[in-house]
């Protein structure tokens, strides 16, 4: 019998699609006269996901509706409902503006760049990355702390456009419809409320340099990267239609907002003294006004280039537990896939997920700190596992997280902890 599906004389079963035997794959699912392996099932799911994404992008002249954008964001980002709504509307309007720019010449629609304000690890970068994936447009990230004014040691602002061009495979037209995410934008705030008499090449100077490309200019980009020199030929990239999303943790901004909102209520004998601020920074951020950003150190022109403002809140224990297990690319699913490659099942108890979430909250690292916690918990197991035989399952309990206890190893013929010999 052919080995493209069914079984042979030795009763070995084969996948009807790829022809692999039951010994070469992890799972073989039986149907009426056919079999399909887990690898082919995953391949089919990938094809369906890609086709679904393509049909989403192609709908309505290539512009997904805000609800469609929000739905995909929900698959990858837990919580932050208000920020997702603001971003969905802003991005939809931005690309609608691009598609209809040539159809209506009477009213010129201004570009609406976006400012994301939220604590470390609250999902700012992930939101921007997911938006670019949904829209199938070139995407690049830049760290504001590495940027300096042209002519100084550091990275030129125009290098951001070069990175976007590289992400678009040097297709200038595609790059001009891309998305740029600038992280740590709060780190380029002016060092004091008063204009500096000395050159601030990594603060206000960078804000001034970013103004032009964010508003719209034709940037001369050296295709080889690095500093410009007269012998190079430059590529001309119009930044007018590039969407800029800036994000930052803005440490200390909550105190500026609180002091403004309290005002002068505590002056005089008859005044009511406001209670001490006991809200989390993420809650206070919702009340941010342009004047607060001005006091923080952003210059007025820069604030004006970021008209859409979305604030992200602190992630609580329940949200962090969901982040660990629910999104399509959740951390737990990633580690389970790694263990599957060793033909071992990884089980993490619900209480263990809660303990991991509490550790991240204690460290004040948000979702960003979850991976390092998972790595430290699973390090010894991942070190030992490839050399062990007969292990079918590894179980992580709350004690493993909180008390550094050994994980439970379940063998094909017995049960033992990580200290047991193979």
From Swiss-Prot:
InterPro entries linked: AAA+_ATPase (IPR003593), ATP-dep_Clp_protease_ClpX (IPR050052), ATPase_AAA_core (IPR003959), Clp_ATPase_C (IPR019489), Clp_protease_ATP-bd_su_ClpX (IPR004487), ClpX_bact (IPR046425), P-loop_NTPase (IPR027417), Znf_CppX_C4 (IPR010603)
Matching Pfam families: AAA_2, ClpB_D2-small, zf-C4_ClpX
Keywords assigned by UniProt, alphabetized: ATP-binding, Chaperone, Metal-binding, Nucleotide-binding, Zinc
One cellular-component annotation, GO: HslUV protease complex
Amino acids binding Zn(2+): 15, 18, 37, 40
CDD domains listed in its UniProt record: RecA-like_ClpX (cd19497)
Superkingdom of the source species: Bacteria
Protein's GO biological process: cell division; proteolysis involved in protein catabolic process
Family: Belongs to the ClpX chaperone family.
NCBIfam families associated with the record: clpX (TIGR00382), PRK05342.1 (NF003745)
Function: ATP-dependent specificity component of the Clp protease. It directs the protease to specific substrates. Can perform chaperone functions in the absence of ClpP.
Subunit structure: Component of the ClpX-ClpP complex. Forms a hexameric ring that, in the presence of ATP, binds to fourteen ClpP subunits assembled into a disk-like structure with a central cavity, resembling the structure of eukaryotic proteasomes.
Protein known as: ATP-dependent Clp protease ATP-binding subunit ClpX
Organism encoding this protein: Xanthobacter autotrophicus (strain ATCC BAA-1158 / Py2)
């Amino acid at each position: 019998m052919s080995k493209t599906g069914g079984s042979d004389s030795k009763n070995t079963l084969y996948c009807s699609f790829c022809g692999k035997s039951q010994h070469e794959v992890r799972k073989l699912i039986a149907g009426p006269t056919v079999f399909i392996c887990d690898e082919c099932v995953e391949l089919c799911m990938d094809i369906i996901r890609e086709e679904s994404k393509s049909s989403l992008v192609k709908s309505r002249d290539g512009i997904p509706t805000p609800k469609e954008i929000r739905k995909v964001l929900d698959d990858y980002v837990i919580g932050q409902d208000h920020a997702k709504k603001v971003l969905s509307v802003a991005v939809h309007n931005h690309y609608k503006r691009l598609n209809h720019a040539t159809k209506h010449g009477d009213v010129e629609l201004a570009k609406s760049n976006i400012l994301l304000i939220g604590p470390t690890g609250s999902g700012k970068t992930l939101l921007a990355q997911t938006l670019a994936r949904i829209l199938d447009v070139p995407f690049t990230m830049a760290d504001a702390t590495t940027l300096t004014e042209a002519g100084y040691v550091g990275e030129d602002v125009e290098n951001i456009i070069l990175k976007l061009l590289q992400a678009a495979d040097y297709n200038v037209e595609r790059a001009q419809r891309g998305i740029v995410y600038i992280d740590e934008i709060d780190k380029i705030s002016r060092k004091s409320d008063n204009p500096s008499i000395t050159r601030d090449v990594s603060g206000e100077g960078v804000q001034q340099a970013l103004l032009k490309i964010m508003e719209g200019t034709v940037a001369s980009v050296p295709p080889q990267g690095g500093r410009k020199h007269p012998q190079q030929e430059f590529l001309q990239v119009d930044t007018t239609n590039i969407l800029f999303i800036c994000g930052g943790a803005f440490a200390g901004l909550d105190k500026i907002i609180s002091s403004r909102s309290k005002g002068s209520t505590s002056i005089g004998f008859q005044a009511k003294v406001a209670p001490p601020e006991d809200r989390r920074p993420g809650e206070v951020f919702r009340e941010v006004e342009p004047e607060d950003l001005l006091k923080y150190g952003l210059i007025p022109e820069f604030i004006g280039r970021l008209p859409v403002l979305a604030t992200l809140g602190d992630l609580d224990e329940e949200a962090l537990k969901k982040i660990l297990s629910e999104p399509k690319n959740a951390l737990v699913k990633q580690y389970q896939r790694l263990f599957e490659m060793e033909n071992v099942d990884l089980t993490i108890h619900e209480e263990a997920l809660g303990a991991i979430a509490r550790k991240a909250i204690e460290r004040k690292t948000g979702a960003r700190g979850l991976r390092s916690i998972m790595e430290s918990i699973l390090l010894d197991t991942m070190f030992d596992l490839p050399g062990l035989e007969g292990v079918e399952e590894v179980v992580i309990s709350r004690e493993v997280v909180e008390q550094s206890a050994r994980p439970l190893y379940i063998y094909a013929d017995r049960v033992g902890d990580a200290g047991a010999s193979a």
